[in-house]
């Protein structure tokens, strides 16, 4: 039996009455966003909206982005990335479980010094992927050129965020490159491995 979105009790400030709200709404009230699935356009739009709202509500308070994602759409992920860089609030990224592909890119894109992972988290980087299907050769060539351009752009950002050379990033992302939390810290994808909530 599938598990739906859990509801939790919530008491409005100054009220004695509780009401039930979904867990993600409750977390957002604590400035917590949970990226726990594939990055799609719809999910990216919701995360961007949350980031913009929370930043406008109190730009001096940090926003916590928990990540357990296999990755997903590059364009959707770049919308989240650009918004993270645009807003005034610090975005503290925390890997729980797996941050792969675009999930790892977003993890590394948190506020410097505030990119974290739990001890048993796994992080994986690789090059962007695209499909060809049954199409004309010129269309395939156009898509291949765009994927190569995006790959270069992502690699340049990762090199900047991690302190690695562009050549090392290109080599390491040529195939799936898995890291433990400690290895990701040494690589520069995160700043610290945490065991308790001291952030």
UniProtKB/Swiss-Prot annotation:
What's a single GO CC term here?
Answer: endopeptidase Clp complex
Q: Which GO terms describe its biological process?
A: protein quality control for misfolded or incompletely synthesized proteins
Q: Which Gene3D superfamilies match?
A: 2-enoyl-CoA Hydratase, Chain A, domain 1 (3.90.226.10)
Alphabetical list of CDD domains matching this protein: S14_ClpP_2
User: What EC designation does it have?
Assistant: 3.4.21.92
**Any Pfam family the entry gives:** CLP_protease
Instruction: State whether it acts alone or in a complex, and with which partners, per the record.
Output: Fourteen ClpP subunits assemble into 2 heptameric rings which stack back to back to give a disk-like structure with a central cavity, resembling the structure of eukaryotic proteasomes.
Q: Give the protein's recorded name.
A: ATP-dependent Clp protease proteolytic subunit
Organism source for this protein? Answer: Rippkaea orientalis (strain PCC 8801 / RF-1)
Q: Which gene encodes it?
A: clpP
């Amino acid at each position: 039996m599938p598990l739906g979105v859990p509801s939790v009790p919530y008491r409005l400030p100054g009220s004695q009455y509780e009401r039930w709200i979904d867990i993600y709404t409750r977390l957002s009230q604590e400035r917590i966003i949970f990226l726990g699935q594939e990055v799609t356009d719809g999910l990216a739009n919701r995360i961007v909206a949350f980031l913009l709202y929370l930043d406008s509500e109190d730009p001096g308070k940090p926003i916590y982005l928990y990540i357990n994602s296999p990755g997903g759409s590059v364009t959707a992920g770049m919308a989240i990335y650009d918004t993270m860089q645009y807003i005034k609030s610090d975005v503290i990224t925390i890997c729980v479980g797996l941050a792969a592909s675009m999930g790892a890119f977003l993890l590394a894109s948190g506020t410097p010094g505030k990119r974290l992972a739990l001890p048993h988290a796994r992080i994986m980087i690789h090059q962007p992927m695209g499909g060809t299907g049954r199409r004309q050769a010129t269309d395939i060539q156009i898509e291949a050129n765009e994927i190569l351009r995006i790959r270069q752009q992502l690699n340049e950002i990762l090199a900047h965020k991690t302190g690695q050379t562009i050549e090392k990033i290109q080599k390491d992302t040529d195939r799936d490159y898995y890291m433990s939390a400690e290895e990701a810290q040494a690589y520069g994808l995160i700043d610290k491995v945490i065991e308790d909530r001291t952030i």
